[in-house]
């Protein structure tokens, strides 16, 4: 009996991981901002934050996720209500497929929240 394999296609390859963090901030938290030559995403686990990326300002709530593309200036500030908890992961990826995430606001579900929690646990 002959076995036939299935060839897999690679669409997104992470070359390096720079940081994996879970932050529990105060309700008056403010980060003045930065830019760097790698991707980063921020996901709100609790509370609410205002994020500037380039010239765009967005309010993120629980379950919201955005990507910062390489060299994009970005900052984050708590909105003053519920103290925010954030997942922040930064990484190198040179694949064109990543540009799908430019300027998008995504919402994650409970399954995806659990996957992020497992990544945080593994990174400790």
Model segments located where?
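Ligand-binding loop in jelly-roll beta-barrel domains
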Residues: 71-99
């Amino acid at each position: 009996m002959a076995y036939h394999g299935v060839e897999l296609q690679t669409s997104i390859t992470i070359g390096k991981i720079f940081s994996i963090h879970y932050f529990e901030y105060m309700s008056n938290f403010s980060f003045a901002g930065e830019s760097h030559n790698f991707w980063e995403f921020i996901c709100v686990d609790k509370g609410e934050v205002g994020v500037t990326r380039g010239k765009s300002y967005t309010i993120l709530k629980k379950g919201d996720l955005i990507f910062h593309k390489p060299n994009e200036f970005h900052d984050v500030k708590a909105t003053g209500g519920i103290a925010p908890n954030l997942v922040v992961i930064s990484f190198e990826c040179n694949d064109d497929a990543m540009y799908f995430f430019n300027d998008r606001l995504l919402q994650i579900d409970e399954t995806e929240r659990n996957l992020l929690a497992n990544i945080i646990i593994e990174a400790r």
